[in-house]
Structure formats: C-alpha cells, structure tokens
Amino acid sequence: MQYKTFLVIFLAYLLVTEEALAFWGALAKGALKLIPSLVSSFTKKDKRALKNIFDPYQKNLDLELERLLSQLQ
C-alpha cells in the first residue's frame, strides 16, 4: 500500500515541476524507439513464416542429387 502512495506523490510531483518535461520526454522518446522495433519484429516473423524454405537453386540441387543417387542404386 505504501508503494501506491509513493507512486501517487511522485506522479503529482512530476506534474507540478519542470522535471516533468524531462521525465515524460524521456518516456516518449523510449516509446517511440520501442514501438517500431516491436512492430518490425512481428512483421519479420510473419514474412519468414510465409517464405518458402528452399530457394529454386536448392530445389534443383536436391533433385539432381536424388537423380544421381537413384542411378547409383
């Protein structure tokens, strides 16, 4: 319960003093850096999930290897 009282007093202090500009500015600056990085990390995962595992050259190499192995047997 004491931490809630301290938090209310701290926020009230920030609202009436000039330090509030620096505090809220630092929070906003951090949020502006954090939000785009979170959004981009989620979109990268989606793109990676949709991307095909093999590129065309790898598929061709796999088919060629299977063909050569079948000739050996």
From Swiss-Prot:
Top-level taxon: Eukaryota
Question: What is stated as this protein's family in its record?
Answer: Belongs to the non-disulfide-bridged peptide (NDBP) superfamily. Medium-length antimicrobial peptide (group 3) family.
Q: What is this protein called?
A: Heterin-2
Q: Does the keyword Signal apply?
A: yes
Pfam families tied to this protein = Antimicrobial_4
**Which purpose does this protein serve, as stated in its record?**
Amphipathic peptide with potent activities against Gram-positive bacteria (MIC=5.6-30.0 uM) and weaker activities against the tested Gram-negative bacteria (MIC=15 uM to >45 uM). It has high hemolytic activity against human erythrocytes. May act by disrupting the integrity of the bacterial cell membrane.
The processes (GO biological process) annotated in the record are: defense response to other organism; killing of cells of another organism
Query: InterPro entries, from UniProt?
Result: Antimicrobial_4 (IPR012523)
Tell me the organism.
Heterometrus spinifer
Residue numbers covered by the propeptide annotation in the UniProt entry: 47-73
Q: Which GO terms describe its cellular component?
A: extracellular region; membrane; other organism cell membrane
Signal peptide from the UniProt entry? 1-22
Record has RNA-binding as a keyword: no
Tissues of expression: Expressed by the venom gland.
Tell me where it resides: Secreted; Target cell membrane
Q: Which UniProt keywords apply?
A: Cleavage on pair of basic residues, Cytolysis, Hemolysis, Membrane, Secreted, Signal, Target cell membrane, Target membrane
